[in-house]
């Protein structure tokens, strides 16, 4: 039964505020929770502070908070001390539904233990453009059938552990070359990109709508602000009845073109249930309340959104118990079982592109797009006696991450050239990529292998594969 709510309390339930542990503003989040926001999206933190912080917010809230985070690569993607799992593209290289479901289960177990039951994953975008600056290894791959199978399996694993998965970014963010954190991408037609959302929706308790214009559906508005996309295509066209959320409303694709308060109202008008990460949560509530009182926002629409939100909270157990068990953090988060799951996925993902292996001795040259040292990879090779300054084999370790707000992905050609100079005496070059596989297009090598992220598990797997301890059974899920 829906609790009694005032009009302001209803619209507040639609707002999901943000909190960043690296830039904490406790006064702001406390005010937002007291004002009745329906959820909070967390960034950063550690296993030592997340659960207690969430419990404090839950005790402050009149209604249970639906707490979310971007756990695309496991809870460790955001929370230090939690398990970092290999990327979706790594799972795509395995082709294994079993491993996709395992990733979903491990992610959800740790998320629930931390008090964060809304898992903002899986990414269901198709990775079809090498110059896409924001999807890349976040995707399972280029093939719609593969993405559907693995996305469904991941979501199934999340649901089995009592958490809520979120497929994103509807209607498909893969076939663009613009980062929506900075600008508004434009897509002619969703085409095959709709397939994973349509075919996986039975397993998805929520779907996130992306900030991009789809000219074939609505050439005038971003999908997040378009009733033709949200109500027309997603609800009526595909028949989706679950929770629908916007992508973060503070992103440049929205804020560069429209006032923040107006964007929140338009997103609600379009049919979104949850308005994620507005720049000003209190201002968002005020704007929604004003729109409701003026008749601009239909009360029946708001009621339907609130019912979906409350149903989601019930399904993940918040109605019965909103308080996370601190003991579960110690027992579950970052446990040996989960670390072994990460290793299992990583080892199954290693992909041989060309050439002969194993490599017994080599000089290693690190080439990165910044801030990544691949310490585990080096240490694992050193432990096996595989590092040698005198070797005539040179290993170029290529690390390239997808980062929001950068607008590009890849390694500076000048950095690549310098690394080749340092390996000038090598008779044989072996390229090993950690993350973005397209970097191999820019590197001439005699042999090459891929892992699809720089997690410790993937670094260990790459080292073991390089020296011949494990096979390379992964299959490249994109076209280079």
What positions do the PLM features span?
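Preference for extracellular/luminal or secreted protein segments
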Residues: 1-36, 236-237, 256-480
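Second-shell residues forming the walls of enzyme active-site clefts
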Residues: 6, 31, 40, 45-65, ...
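Flexible hinge/switch segments at interdomain interfaces of large molecular machines
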Residues: 8, 79-82, 120-129, 170-174, ...
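Active-site mouth loops of central-metabolism enzymes
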Residues: 13-24, 88-102, 181-192, 250-258
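Short glycine-enriched loops at secondary-structure junctions
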Residues: 19-23, 67-77, 117-127, 167-171, ...
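Catalytic domains of carbohydrate-active enzymes, especially glycoside hydrolases
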Residues: 29-43, 105-118
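Surface-exposed, active-site-proximal loop segments in enzymatic domains
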Residues: 80-93, 129-140, 179-185
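A substrate-binding/cap region within the structured catalytic cores of diverse enzymes
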Residues: 95-116, 123-139, 144, 151, ...
